[in-house]
């Protein structure tokens, strides 16, 4: 996915481990590798979490309209400029 025209709000999350809550009460944890203007996400090293059950699913593309919340699981630095 191209980096031009990306909303700066998501740039600070690149290469960071995130918890992403999806519609239908689904949750994944993984590393953000890319996104586009529709908030479609490319997530690597992804684990789907369902209660106490964890399922490694590798690299996935998440459709933007499925995303409910995105939470950083590691410190994020706000870069100016």
From Swiss-Prot:
Residues covered by the Sm domain: 5-76
Keyword Nucleus: yes
Location of the protein in the cell: Nucleus
Domain of life: Eukaryota
PROSITE patterns reported in the protein's UniProt record: SM
Keywords: mRNA processing, mRNA splicing, Nucleus, Ribonucleoprotein, RNA-binding, Spliceosome
GO CC, alphabetical: catalytic step 2 spliceosome; P granule; precatalytic spliceosome; SMN-Sm protein complex; spliceosomal tri-snRNP complex; U1 snRNP; U12-type spliceosomal complex; U2 snRNP
GO biological process: mRNA splicing, via spliceosome
Molecular function per GO: RNA binding
Role, per record: Probable common Sm protein, is found in U1 and U2 snRNPs and may be part of the spliceosome.
UniProt record similarity statement: Belongs to the snRNP Sm proteins family.
The protein's name: Probable small nuclear ribonucleoprotein G
């Amino acid at each position: 996915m191209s980096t031009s025209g990306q909303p700066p709000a998501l740039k600070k999350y690149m290469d960071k481990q995130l918890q992403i809550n999806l519609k239908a009460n689904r949750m994944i944890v993984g590393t953000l590798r890319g996104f586009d203007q529709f908030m479609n996400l490319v997530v690597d090293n992804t684990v789907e979490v369902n209660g106490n059950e964890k399922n490694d699913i590798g690299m996935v593309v998440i459709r933007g309209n499925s995303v409910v919340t995105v939470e950083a699981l590691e410190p994020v630095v706000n870069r100016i400029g």
